[in-house]
C-alpha cells in the first residue's frame, strides 16, 4: 500500500486547518470538554477563569488577595483586624456590642421602643396625643383659649379682668363687697340677705313693701304702725356684766337718755367679788370706748348687755349718743366740759369725754375707801351729743 504524502505546511495541532474560520465558538476535539476552557486567541487553547483567579508574573495560576487575607504554605488565612468599640473581636468573629435600646433581632440590628415612641415605615416616630402637635419638626404643646406661652417659652394662663395669677394659684381679683376665700361670696350688712333661691334680697321691716316697679315704698296697709323712737341705751342686767379686776366681778348699770342735743346719764356700779369686796386702792377708773359709728368696742362691759331700752336690741351705730367731738376734743382730759362732782361725803365722781385717739369714749373715775366694799352711790351727768 502506498503511503499518503503529507503536505509541507501541515500543522499537527488540532484544528489542523488554522487558516479557516471555525463556524462554532469552540473548536476543540470532541474528546475535550469545553468547561473551563476557551480558544483565545483563535487557534490557542486556554483556561477560562474569573476573579479572584489570576496569573502571576511567572504565568502561574494564583488568587487575588484582599485586605486581611493571606496565603501561607498553600493555605488561605483570614486575619481579623483590630477593632474599636462598638465593634468586637471574639474567637476570630467580628461582632457589634449593643446596649438598650439597641438590640439584635432576627440577625438584624433593631431599636427597642416604648410608648409613645414607635417605628412606622422603617422610621422612628412619636405618637402625639391630645394637646400635643409636631410643628417645624419639633414636639410642642398645642394651646388654645386662655393658654399660651410667656417670653421664656413656658406654658402660662392668660388672666383677664377679675382674675390674676399669684405664684402657682389662679385667684379671683375682686373688690368689696365681694370676697373670695374658698368661694366667691358677698359681704352683707344689715338690711340685706341671700334667699333660699340664691338671690340677693332687701329685708323689709314693718311698714315697708315693694311697689310694682320693685322699689321700696311705705306700706299702704290701713293699720297704723308706730316706729319707736330710740332715746335710751342702758346696760341693765340681773347678772354680773362687768370685769374690772377679774371676770364678772361687778355689776354696772349705765343709762343714757337722749333729749335733743343733750344726753342725761345715770351710772352706778357694785363690786361683787375679789378686790372689789375689799378695796386696796383709793380710786377706781372705768373706760368705755366706742368706734366712729358709736359701736361699743371690747372693754370691761359685756357688749351683749348694752341695749336699746325701747326694743331690747343690742345697741349699734349709736352715734347720736356719743359725746360731741368739738365740745369735747379727743385726748383733751383737762377740757372744762368734763365733770367732777361730790356724790357722798367721802366719794367723788368724775367723767372724762373722748379720752381716746379716734372714736369716742367715756372714762368714769370714783374715789374709794380702802378696806371697804366698792359700791358708790348713783351718779348723774349730762353732756352734748355728736348729732
Swiss-Prot record:
> Per the entry, what induces it?
Expressed in the late phase of the viral replicative cycle.
- Gene3D superfamilies, per the entry: 6.20.10.20, Adenovirus pIV-related, attachment domain
* GO CC annotation, single: host cell nucleus
One GO BP on record is: adhesion receptor-mediated virion attachment to host cell
Please give the positions of the paired cysteines in each disulfide bond. none
Localization annotation = Virion; Host nucleus
- What is this protein for, i.e. what is its function? Forms spikes that protrude from each vertex of the icosahedral capsid. Interacts with host receptor CXCAR to provide virion initial attachment to target cell. Fiber proteins are shed during virus entry, when virus is still at the cell surface.
Domain remark text: The tail region anchors the fiber to penton base capsomers, whereas the shaft, built from several repeated motifs, allows the knob to protrude from the virion.
Question: What other remark does the UniProt record contain for this protein?
Answer: All late proteins expressed from the major late promoter are produced by alternative splicing and alternative polyadenylation of the same gene giving rise to non-overlapping ORFs. A leader sequence is present in the N-terminus of all these mRNAs and is recognized by the viral shutoff protein to provide expression although conventional translation via ribosome scanning from the cap has been shut off in the host cell.
Protein name from the UniProt record: Fiber protein 2
Native organism is Human adenovirus F serotype 41
Amino acid at each position: 500500500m502506498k503511503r499518503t504524502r503529507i503536505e509541507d505546511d501541515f500543522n499537527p495541532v488540532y484544528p489542523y486547518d488554522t487558516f479557516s474560520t471555525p463556524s462554532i465558538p469552540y473548536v476543540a476535539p470532541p474528546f475535550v470538554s469545553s468547561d473551563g476552557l476557551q480558544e483565545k486567541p483563535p487557534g490557542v487553547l486556554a483556561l477560562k477563569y474569573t476573579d479572584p483567579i489570576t496569573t502571576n508574573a511567572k504565568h502561574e495560576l494564583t488568587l487575588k488577595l484582599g485586605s486581611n487575607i493571606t496565603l501561607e504554605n498553600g493555605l488561605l488565612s483570614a486575619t481579623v483586624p483590630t477593632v474599636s468599640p462598638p465593634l468586637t473581636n471574639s474567637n476570630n468573629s467580628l461582632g457589634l456590642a449593643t446596649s438598650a435600646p439597641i438590640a439584635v433581632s432576627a440577625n438584624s440590628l433593631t431599636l427597642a421602643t416604648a410608648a409613645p415612641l414607635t417605628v412606622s415605615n422603617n422610621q422612628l416616630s412619636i405618637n402625639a396625643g391630645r394637646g400635643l402637635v409636631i410643628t417645624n419638626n419639633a414636639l410642642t404643646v398645642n394651646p388654645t383659649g386662655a393658654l399660651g406661652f410667656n417670653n421664656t417659652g413656658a406654658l402660662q394662663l392668660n388672666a383677664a379682668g377679675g382674675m390674676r395669677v399669684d405664684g402657682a394659684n389662679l385667684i379671683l381679683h375682686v373688690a368689696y363687697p365681694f370676697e373670695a376665700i374658698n368661694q366667691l361670696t358677698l359681704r352683707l350688712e344689715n338690711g340685706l340677705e341671700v334667699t333660699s333661691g340664691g338671690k340677693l334680697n332687701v329685708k323689709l321691716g314693718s311698714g315697708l313693701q315693694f311697689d310694682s316697679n320693685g322699689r321700696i315704698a311705705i306700706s299702704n296697709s290701713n293699720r297704723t304702725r308706730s316706729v319707736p323712737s330710740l332715746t335710751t341705751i342702758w346696760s341693765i342686767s340681773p347678772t354680773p356684766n362687768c370685769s374690772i379686776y377679774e371676770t364678772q366681778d361687778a355689776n354696772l348699770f349705765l343709762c343714757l337718755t337722749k333729749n335733743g342735743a343733750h344726753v342725761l346719764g345715770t351710772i352706778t356700779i357694785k363690786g361683787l367679788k375679789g378686790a372689789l369686796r375689799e378695796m386696796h386702792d383709793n380710786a377706781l377708773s372705768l373706760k368705755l370706748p366706742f368706734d366712729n359709728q358709736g359701736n361699743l368696742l371690747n372693754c370691761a362691759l359685756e357688749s351683749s348687755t348694752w341695749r336699746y331700752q325701747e326694743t331690747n336690741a343690742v345697741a349699734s351705730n349709736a352715734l347720736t349718743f356719743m359725746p360731741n367731738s368739738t365740745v369735747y376734743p379727743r385726748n383733751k382730759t383737762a377740757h372744762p366740759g368734763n365733770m367732777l362732782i361730790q356724790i357722798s361725803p367721802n366719794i367723788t365722781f368724775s367723767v372724762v369725754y373722748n379720752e381716746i385717739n379716734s372714736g369716742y369714749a367715756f372714762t368714769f373715775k370714783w374715789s374709794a375707801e380702802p378696806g371697804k366694799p366698792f359700791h358708790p352711790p348713783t351718779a348723774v351727768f349730762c353732756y352734748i351729743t355728736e348729732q
